[in-house]
C-alpha cells in the first residue's frame, strides 16, 4: 500500500531534498549506522564461515568446543591462535571478516600501543586492542544509546508539555516552576554522583541521563499546545463532545510534532556528547566497553601515540557534524517561510 503524502508534507520533503548538504549528511549517517549495526560481520576474531574436514561451521553465530576441531578442551578455541591456524590451513578453510579483531581482542604480537599497520589499520590502544574495531563497536553503542535516550526523553517531554499547555492554570504554573528549578541543577555533577552510586550499566546510565534530558522539549510542546487549544477546530471538537485525551493527541499533538521533529537531531548530538563526556571521566559505561569517551581518555594518556587522539577526534567531529547538518536541513524544511 502506497503512502499518500499531503501537499504540505510533499513540499517539506522536497525542501529537504533540495538541501544538498543535509541530504548527503543523512545518507552518510545512515550508511555509518547500518555499517555499525553489522559490526560482528566486519570486525571479529572469529571466522564468518569455516569448513573443516567436510563439515561447515558458523563461528560468528555459534560457539563450538575445541573438541570439534580435534582439540582436547570443551571450550571455544582461539581461532587466530597457532592450534586453529594449523588445523584450518591443513584440513579446511575459513572466510574471515575484513578486520580480524573484535572490540576486546588483544594483539599480543605487537607492543601496545602500536601504530597503524596492515594488521591493525588504525593501530592498537594501550592494551593492545584494535582501534578500528573499538571505533566501530563504540559508534554502534553511542548511536543506539543516543537514539534510545532521545526517544525516551522526547516522549516524556512531549507528555509534560502537552499537559501543561492544554490545561494551563495551576498545572502550567507549577510545572514551569519545577522545570526552572530542575533545569538549574548542575546536571553533569549530579550525573557523576548518581553514576558513582550504582553498578555501571547501560540501563542505569540511560535512566540517570533521562532524569535531566526530558526537559528539552517541554517548552516547545507547551507553546504549541497553548496556541493550539484556542484554535477554531479544537473548539469545534470540544463542542462535539471529544474528550481531553482525544483533543490533545488527535488534534493538537500532530501540529506540535512539527516543532518537535526539528529538535531531534540536536538532541541526538547532546546525548552522544554527554555519554562521551561521562565515559571520558570514568563514570559512564562499564570498564572495557567499547566507547568513544574511553578512546578520548586513551588519547589524552598516550600523547606519544597520536593515532589514538586523532582517530577519535575525526570520528566524533564527523558524527556530530552529520547530525547538525541533518538537523539544520530538517529545520529549514519545516520552516513555513521556505
Model-assigned labels for residue ranges:
Residues 124-338:
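Alpha-helical transmembrane segments of integral membrane proteins
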Residues 1-154, 158, 162-163, 271, ...:
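Gly/Trp-centered helix-boundary motif
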Amino acid at each position: 500500500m502506497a503512502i499518500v503524502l499531503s501537499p504540505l508534507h510533499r513540499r517539506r520533503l522536497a525542501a529537504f531534498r533540495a538541501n544538498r548538504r543535509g541530504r548527503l549528511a543523512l545518507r552518510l549517517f545512515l550508511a555509518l549506522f547500518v555499517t555499525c549495526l553489522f559490526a560482528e560481520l566486519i570486525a571479529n576474531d572469529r571466522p564468518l564461515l569455516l569448513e573443516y574436514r567436510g563439515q561447515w561451521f558458523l563461528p560468528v553465530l555459534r560457539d563450538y568446543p575445541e573438541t570439534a576441531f580435534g582439540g582436547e578442551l570443551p571450550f571455544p578455541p582461539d581461532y587466530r591462535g597457532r592450534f586453529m591456524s594449523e588445523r584450518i590451513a591443513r584440513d579446511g578453510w575459513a572466510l574471515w571478516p575484513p578486520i580480524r579483531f573484535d572490540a576486546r581482542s588483544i594483539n599480543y604480537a605487537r607492543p601496545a600501543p602500536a601504530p597503524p599497520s596492515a594488521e591493525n589499520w588504525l593501530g592498537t590502544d594501550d592494551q593492545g586492542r584494535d582501534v578500528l574495531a573499538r571505533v566501530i563497536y563504540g559508534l554502534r553503542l553511542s548511536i543506539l544509546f543516543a537514539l534510545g535516550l532521545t526517544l525516551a526523553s522526547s516522549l516524556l517531554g512531549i507528555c509534560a508539555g502537552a499537559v501543561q499547555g492544554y490545561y494551563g492554570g495551576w498545572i502550567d504554573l507549577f510545572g514551569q516552576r519545577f522545570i526552572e528549578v530542575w533545569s538549574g541543577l548542575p546536571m553533569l555533577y549530579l550525573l557523576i554522583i548518581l553514576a558513582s552510586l550504582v553498578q555501571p550499566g547501560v540501563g542505569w546510565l540511560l535512566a540517570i541521563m533521562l532524569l535531566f534530558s526530558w526537559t528539552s522539549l517541554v517548552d516547545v510542546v507547551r507553546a504549541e499546545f497553548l496556541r493550539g487549544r484556542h484554535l477554531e477546530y479544537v473548539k469545534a471538537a470540544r463542542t462535539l463532545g471529544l474528550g481531553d485525551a482525544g483533543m490533545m493527541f488527535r488534534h493538537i499533538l500532530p501540529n506540535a510534532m512539527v516543532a518537535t521533529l526539528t529538535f531531534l537531531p540536536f538532541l541526538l548530538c547532546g546525548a552522544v556528547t554527554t555519554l562521551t563526556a561521562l565515559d571520558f571521566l570514568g563514570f559512564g559505561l562499564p570498564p572495557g566497553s567499547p566507547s568513544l569517551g574511553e578512546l578520548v581518555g586513551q588519547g589524552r594518556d598516550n600523547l606519544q601515540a597520536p593515532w589514538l587522539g586523532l582517530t577519535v577526534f575525526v570520528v566524533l567531529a564527523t558524527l556530530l557534524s552529520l547530525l547538525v547538518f541533518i538537523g539544520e536541513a530538517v529545520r529549514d524544511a519545516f520552516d513555513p517561510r521556505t
